[in-house]
A protein has these predicted regions:
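Conserved beta-strand-loop-alpha-helix junction that forms the acyl-donor binding cleft
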Residues: 131, 156-166, 182-185
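Conserved acetyl-CoA-binding loop of GNAT-fold acetyltransferases
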Residues: 170-179
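Glycine-rich phosphate-binding loop
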Residues: 134
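Conserved active-site tyrosine of GNAT-family acetyltransferases
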Residues: 54, 168-170
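Acetyl-CoA-dependent GNAT
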Residues: 25-28, 32, 41-47, 52-127, ...
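Conserved hydrophobic beta-strand within the GNAT/NAT acetyltransferase core sheet
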Residues: 121-124, 155-159
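Acyl-donor-binding surface of acyltransferase catalytic domains
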Residues: 1-33
């Protein structure tokens, strides 16, 4: 029953997202072209805009009121100042006007028993007007390549089962992980990142 309810929630949330045709039209109306977008690592100076992007993209994803932008900015500021251990990264999607329109945050986790490193795709978001244009696929691939560059060949994503982006995760080869009770809680696993690096 829980899986069914979550699937309905994903479907409803997904209905409110713009179609590919709509977003291509909006892209042209803004005078943008796909080749004009760049991808780069986030820096501490990006904190104000990154926090704003995070808050808005989260609200769009779950059809919720925009969370406190200042809270998100604080969280990112804390990440840059207190978690500067080299065990995480954030890749940004930037348009020609230098506006942030998407990001992916990855974390490197170390197994306490084997000392083996594992990838955690902690967050991946695009503003709704920039979805279904291939930018998310490129962003995902860059995150995969970053993990591979660290010698990591597997990755997990611990999301929310109501997230309509579950379809995207599965399109990118994510395998659903189920709880002992058989419920899907939004978690995915990729066991061979080398196969994904060429997407």
């Amino acid at each position: 029953m829980k899986n069914f309810i979550n699937s309905i929630s994903r479907f409803i949330n997904g209905l409110k997202r713009p179609s590919k045709k709509t977003n291509i039209k909006k892209l042209h109306e803004r005078g943008e072209i796909l080749d004009s977008f760049t991808f780069r690592d986030a820096t501490e100076e990006d904190t104000p805009e990154l926090g704003k992007l995070h808050a808005i993209a989260w609200a769009e994803t779950y059809n919720a009121k925009t969370p406190n932008i200042q809270l998100r900015q604080y969280q990112w500021q804390k990440a840059f100042t207190e978690e500067n251990d080299g065990l995480w990264f954030c890749i940004l999607v930037v348009n020609a006007k230098n506006k942030l329109v998407g990001f992916a945050k990855g974390k490197i986790n170390k197994d306490e028993h084997t000392s083996q490193l594992h990838g955690d795709l902690n967050k991946i978001y695009l503003l709704s007007d920039y979805q279904r244009l291939g930018l998310g696929k490129k962003l995902f691939t860059l995150a995969v390549q970053r993990f591979l560059s660290k010698g990591i060949n597997d990755m997990s994503l611990f999301g929310v089962p109501q997230n309509p982006s579950c379809a995207f995760h599965e399109a990118m080869g994510g395998e659903r992980l189920y709880s002992e009770k058989g419920t899907f809680d939004g978690c995915y696993r990729w066991d061979d990142l080398k196969k994904l690096a060429v997407h």
